[in-house]
């Protein structure tokens, strides 16, 4: 998927985290470049 900013992340139902995705979530893209990940629940 082409999630590369926080707006697209929100559209896909995700949220931005500066560390790795917590708990039962998976990374679906990035928010503000590489370090900040866009995560979403399974």
UniProtKB/Swiss-Prot annotation:
Domain of life: Eukaryota
Gene: DEFB6
Membership in a protein family: Belongs to the beta-defensin family.
Entries under InterPro entries matching the protein: Beta/alpha-defensin_C, Defensin_beta-like
Tissues in which the UniProt entry reports expression: Neutrophilic granules.
GO molecular function: CCR6 chemokine receptor binding; chemoattractant activity
Role description: Has bactericidal activity. Active against E.coli ML35 and S.aureus 502A.
A GO CC term attached to the entry: extracellular space
Keyword terms: Antibiotic, Antimicrobial, Defensin, Disulfide bond, Pyrrolidone carboxylic acid, Secreted
Protein name, per record: Beta-defensin 6
Disulfide bonds: 9-38, 16-31, 21-39
Modified residues (Pyrrolidone carboxylic acid): 1
Principal localisation: secreted
Pfam families: Defensin_beta
Keyword Disulfide bond appears in the UniProt entry: yes
Keyword Disulfide bond: yes
GO biological process, alphabetically ordered: cell chemotaxis; defense response to bacterium
Cellular compartment(s): Secreted
């Amino acid at each position: 998927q082409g999630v590369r900013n926080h707006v697209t992340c929100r559209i896909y139902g995700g949220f931005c985290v500066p560390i790795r995705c917590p708990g039962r979530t998976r990374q679906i893209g990035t928010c503000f470049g590489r370090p900040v990940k866009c995560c979403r629940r399974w």
